[in-house]
Design a protein with these regions (language model features):
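Active-site-adjacent betaalpha module
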Residues: 1-10, 37-45, 70-193
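Acidic-leg catalytic submotif of subtilisin-like serine proteases
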Residues: 10-16
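Short, flexible, mixed-charge acidic loops at enzyme active sites
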Residues: 62-70
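A short alpha/beta connector and helix-capping loop motif
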Residues: 7-9, 25-42, 46-55
């Protein structure tokens, strides 16, 4: 059974932006329902909710040619639309709500080049409850970095999504459980009841 120290736990809802949700989660209603329920339970239990989103300045100066993943964004107006305007905002079903923190990143991991670690240290956070889109992107990258920084990670498997279902399942089944507690949304809600 999952046990969380409420004073030292934060939940990271990662890359759950309107444009990304529309591309990666079909249909999105069940995913958004589970994620919204988790965030509601976390807020009610006074856990810190942190939304991590991908975003860039006009002209995309954060993206260099050597970054294979994001170089495609720089050359494609279609990809840029995923991060621009309302499509780049946190999905309205999830927040942000008063008290939530929004961290903008320019790479895959929630930690790379952001002030996330400073926020976590300032709040004496030791446990990170992670979910988001994509399992093989931000979730994997943030999990590995969190482990290396000695956080105690929890992955909400049914609040993660990936375009590649086989890769998603392999990560959840074969890798994540070696580095984190892997639970479902109902487990987090029950732990906070």
């Amino acid at each position: 059974m999952l046990s969380l120290n409420r004073a030292q736990t934060a939940v990271l809802a990662m890359d759950c932006q309107s444009g990304i949700v529309s591309q990666y989660v079909k249909p999105p209603d069940e995913f958004l329902g589970r994620a919204s329920t988790v965030l509601g339970a976390c807020r009610a239990a006074n856990l810190q909710v942190i939304h991590v989103r991908v975003g860039f300045r006009p002209g995309l100066p954060e993206i260099g040619e050597r970054n294979k993943m994001f170089a495609a964004v720089k050359t494609s107006p279609l990809y840029q639309k995923l991060f621009d305007g309302p499509a780049g905002d946190v999905h309205p079903a999830l927040g942000p709500e008063p008290g939530d923190i929004v961290v903008t990143k320019h790479r895959v991991s929630a930690f790379a080049g952001t002030d996330l670690e400073m926020i976590l240290r300032a709040k004496d956070i030791r446990t990170l409850v992670l979910f988001g889109i994509a399992t093989s992107g931000v979730v994997l990258s943030t999990l590995l970095e969190a482990c290396d920084a000695d956080y105690d990670p929890v992955i909400i498997a049914d609040c993660c999504a990936d375009m590649n279902a086989e890769l998603h399942n392999a990560l959840i089944t074969h890798l994540f459980h070696r580095r984190a507690a892997v639970v479902n949304a109902v487990d987090v809600v029950a732990a906070l009841a």
